[in-house]
Structures are given as C-alpha cells and as structure tokens.
C-alpha cells in the first residue's frame, strides 16, 4: 500500500514559501513519537483575528492542539477591542505530518460535527482522540482562500521569485 513510515500533507491553498517551514515540522516530528503534527505561528498586529479565513489554534502546555477554529480563539473576554494579543493568538498553518498508522486511521474516520461546522478536517482527528502535536515556526505561508486572494498571491510569488533570482545571482558572482 504505502511504502513510507510518515507522510507529509501539503494543502493546495496553503503554500510554504520557505523550505525551513517544512523543516520546522519534519525534524521535531521524527524525534517526538507524535502520531500527527502541524505548525502554528504567532499572530501579530497585521493579522486579522476576526477573519474566518485565518484558522487559529489553541494548544496545551505541552504543545498539543486543544482546538482549531475560524473564530477568534482564545477570546479575551475583558478586551472589547478584540485585537491580537502577542503570544496568546496563533495562526494554524495548513501543513500536516502523520505516521502511516494514523493516516490510515484518519482516512477511515467519518466527518464529525465539529469538522462539519468549521470545515476543518483536523477537527476530525481531535474528535476521534488523535493527539495533534503543534510546533511553532516563524515562517509564514501563502494562503489562497478566495478568488480575491489570487492577485495578492501572484504578487507575493513574483516577489519571492525575484528574491530567489537575486540570491542566486549573488552566490554565482565571483568574490573579489
């Protein structure tokens, strides 16, 4: 069936622009004994906490997911501004890694009520008792959630390609 022992799932609407983002997931997973893993990054003031297109994650003290949501979680009850609180709010990045056994179990699971409500497949794992380990990265990914995101994504990809060319030219230039 599958030859590998662990499997990486890259979502088509979430593009990692830096290979280090994947290293931030793969390296700790291979050393952790976790059955499923994913990434988060700290939200900052430029991130829209209220945007349902940005999935948020809340973790326990050991780094396991408590919940994923399109809602602004955790909600700071006494803050009427509903702004991002540094170190408290995290964006979930849509990349996953599974052990072979967990991926096979996950594929056989039925959609649960939480997954159906939020339209987030990782909630199926939580609803079925799979512990999802979440590691932090400083790298952002490129999200494309709606047709209106495409022009901005195209511009970011052009900037990324331009930077890559510039870095490659600088490496190729002879040193004096």
Segments (PLM) and residue ranges:
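Conserved alpha/beta core of the MobA/IspD/sugar-nucleotide pyrophosphorylase nucleotidyltransferase superfamily
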Residues: 84-170
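Electropositive, surface-exposed helix/loop patches at the edges of structured domains
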Residues: 20, 25, 165-176
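Short beta-strand-to-loop acidic/aromatic patch adjacent to the donor-nucleotide binding site
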Residues: 2-15
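A short, conserved beta-strand element in the Rossmann-like catalytic core
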Residues: 15-16, 141
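Short beta-strands and strand-loop turn motifs
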Residues: 7-10, 37-40, 106, 133-137
